[in-house]
Amino acid sequence: MYGSRRLWQENGGISTYRDLLYVCSPTERNRIIHFLSTLPDHFDVEVGDRKFHLVHAMPSDDPDDRIWRRPKPDDPPYFEDRIAVVGHTPTCYMSGDMESPFAVWHGNGLIDIDCGCGNKTELRRLACLRLDDLKEFYI
């Protein structure tokens, strides 16, 4: 767990940690931490006739992998019966396109929606994927 905490802090979590420590009251901090500890790190959903596996980073049985690992564009499908929808890995690394505004990437049973919103590049944007029809929206 220490490794995950360190990674989280190095990836921008330190400002959240400071806010929890210095801005929130102990009661508020405990409520937030309790709430976050009850959330799943992945879940399966069915929309229309499609099934999806939604996960932050990578489909896996290992909880650390679900938060920190990065899929590769040529990975075989993770599931036979559902599409994995991931973030964490900016889509430019999946597409190899470092010159265009980041766009949702569609692979073999995998969709990456991380369009770099948290990065500093001018090409970043927030993406939303409507699961009903896979229509993409950008801000």
What are the language-model segments listed below?
Residues 16, 36, 56, 85, ...:
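Divalent metal-coordination and catalytic microenvironments
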Residues 2-5, 10, 57-78:
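Active-site-proximal segments of metal-dependent phosphoesterases and phosphodiesterases across multiple
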Residues 1, 45, 63, 95, ...:
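Active-site-proximal flexible loops/turns
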